[in-house]
Design a protein with these regions (language model features):
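Extracytosolic secretory-pathway proteins
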Residues: 30-110, 115, 121-215
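N-terminal secretory signal peptides and thylakoid transit peptides that target proteins
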Residues: 1-15
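C-terminal segment of classical bacterial N-terminal signal peptides
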Residues: 18-24
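Cleavable N-terminal signal peptides
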Residues: 14, 25-26
Length: 215
């Protein structure tokens, strides 16, 4: 298998794990209006449709610490600590959320074709679309369009605090659906997947302390 195909496969199999970073997104250069997330974590729970793609490649997934694998009655998920994140969570209009972040830990995807260690997970959310990049077996990928983030379909809980003060935010069960670009890249490398842009590949839950800009 070529290095390019390995990278595409590793990214595609781990794609649902590149998710949405606790309601934040793109660009430290916008810190005049972007706050920060601290004490954060992101949990990515993939759907039966995503599991079917893993099964197609006879793939198993394990977490790389400090990320951890969660298996319970609701299915399988991986929880990642948030290393850094900046953005505007747009608490009164979640679909407008934007920002960027990095996750600690990673995943190991094992298939008969090889082992893929996916680390250095980064994600950017802008205009409702999540892009991401990572390192696959140490080789850095470029930023790729991955998912449409259904932030408006998630559930938001935020503890009331005085204006301008840090507040704890939790957003749950945000659906991720593949973008046309991510499906095109997968199709070019491996043939058409059994999913469409309407398929929910994962649900993301995130929590952290949001500190508004200027604090």
């Amino acid at each position: 298998m070529s290095a390019t195909r390995r990278t595409v496969l590793g990214t595609a199999l781990a794609g649902p794990l590149l998710g949405h970073l606790a309601g934040t997104a793109a660009g430290a250069d916008k810190n005049d209006r972007f706050g920060t997330i601290s004490e954060g974590w992101v949990e990515v729970r993939w759907t039966p449709q995503a599991q079917a793609q893993l099964d197609r490649f006879q793939a198993t997934v394990q977490a790389i610490a400090p990320a951890r694998l969660i298996e319970d009655e609701a299915g399988t998920a991986i929880r990642f600590p948030v290393r850094t994140a900046t953005g505007d969570p747009a608490l009164t209009n979640l679909p407008k959320a934007q920002g960027s972040g990095r996750l600690d830990g990673g995943v190991v995807v094992r298939t008969p074709m090889g082992e893929f260690r996916v680390t250095e997970l980064e994600s950017v959310l802008e205009s409702g679309q999540t892009s991401g990049r990572c390192a696959v077996n140490g080789a850095q990928t470029s930023m790729q369009s991955l998912f449409i983030c259904g932030a408006g379909e998630g559930r938001l809980v935020a503890q009331p605090v005085p204006a301008g003060q840090p507040l704890k935010v939790r957003i749950s069960d945000v659906p991720l659906r593949p973008t046309p670009e991510s499906l095109s890249a997968f199709t070019t490398a491996f043939g058409a997947p059994a999913v469409t842009t309407d398929t929910v590949m994962a649900y993301v839950t995130g929590e952290g302390v949001y500190t508004p800009p200027g604090r």
